[in-house]
Amino acid sequence: MVKFTTFLCIIALLLCSTLTHASARLNPTSVYPEENSFKKLEQGEVICEGVGEEECFLIRRTLVAHTDYIYTQNHNP
C-alpha cells in the first residue's frame, strides 16, 4: 500500500509540474509588439479620443519635443 501511495504522489507531482509549465507559456502576438505603434507615430496618427483639439495639439507637440530631445541629446554642436 505504501508503494502505491508513493507512486500516486509522484504521478500527481509530475502532472502538476507539467500543467504549471504549460500554462506559464504564452504565445507572443508579435516579435516586436511596439512595431505597430511606431508605424502609427511615423504616419502622424496620434489617438486623441475624448480630448479637445487644443489638448491633442499639445500632446503632439510634446511628443515631437521628447523625440527631438532623445535623438539630439548626445550631439555636440
UniProtKB/Swiss-Prot annotation:
UniProt entry tagged with the keyword Cytoplasm: no
Modified residues (Sulfotyrosine): Y69, Y71
Prosegment location in residue numbers: 25-68, 74-77
A cellular-component GO term for this protein: extracellular matrix
Annotated localization: Secreted
GO molecular function, one term: growth factor activity
Keywords: Developmental protein, Differentiation, Growth factor, Secreted, Signal, Sulfation
Tissue: Expressed in stems, roots, mature leaves and flowers. Most abundant in vascular bundles.
Listed transmembrane segments: none
Induction: Up-regulated by ERF115, by brassinosteroid treatment, wounding and fungal infection.
PTM comment: Sulfation is important for activity and for the binding to a putative membrane receptor.
Family matches, as PANTHER family: PHYTOSULFOKINES 3, PHYTOSULFOKINES 5
Record family assignment: Belongs to the phytosulfokine family.
UniProt function note: Promotes plant cell differentiation, organogenesis and somatic embryogenesis as well as cell proliferation. May be involved in the low quiescent center cell proliferation.
Protein name: Phytosulfokines 5
Biological source species: Arabidopsis thaliana
